[in-house]
A protein has these predicted regions:
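Bacterial N-terminal signal peptides
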Residues: 7-17
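C-terminal and inter-domain tail/linker signature
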Residues: 19-157
Length: 157
């Protein structure tokens, strides 16, 4: 059994790098709510916190990915990559921070803080990802921009 796993691993290494990255991510993913949470946190960290958008999509996101964000034309995977890479280029000092996560069945909820520049007021972000077969297949978000004079003194974070 161990020799078979080793042979399989060697065969995967000989494949192209993006296939290898995807295979590695899927091999380490557990098809559970907690496994999906770990996958989404790894994706979010690489794509937005580390600002390696394309590499994160190559590793964690299905080719058939569907985006529901209204700012992204046609909701395709390639459109999201272009949108996020443009955002990272336009706002080089931007910072994303994961505050909390919740995972249930095939859905992962992420509550995040987005600061477009050092010292800028933060946005509150709620992201929802659907995971299938250890790949992100769908995404929704709600973005709350900064507000002046908030009547509620409880923070959104």
């Amino acid at each position: 059994m161990l020799k078979a796993q080793l042979a399989t691993t060697i065969a995967f290494v000989m494949c192209c790098s993006s296939v290898q990255a995807e295979t590695t991510a899927k091999a380490t993913c557990e098809p559970t709510a907690e496994g999906s949470r770990n996958l989404v946190v790894s994706f979010y960290t690489q794509a937005l916190i580390d600002k390696q958008v394309r590499a994160a999509f190559d590793t964690y996101v299905s080719p058939d990915f569907v985006e529901h964000k209204p700012d992204v034309p046609n909701g395709s995977r390639s459109a999201v990559v272009d949108f996020l890479e443009g955002l990272v280029t336009e706002l080089p000092g931007a910072r994303w921070e994961i505050l909390r996560t919740v995972a249930e069945k095939d859905l992962v909820f992420l509550h995040a803080r987005f600061s477009p520049a050092p010292g800028a007021p933060p946005y509150a972000i709620a992201d929802v990802f659907r995971v299938d077969n250890c790949a992100i297949v769908e995404h929704w978000d709600v973005v709350g921009p900064p507000r002046d004079g908030m009547p509620n003194k409880n923070s959104r974070f």
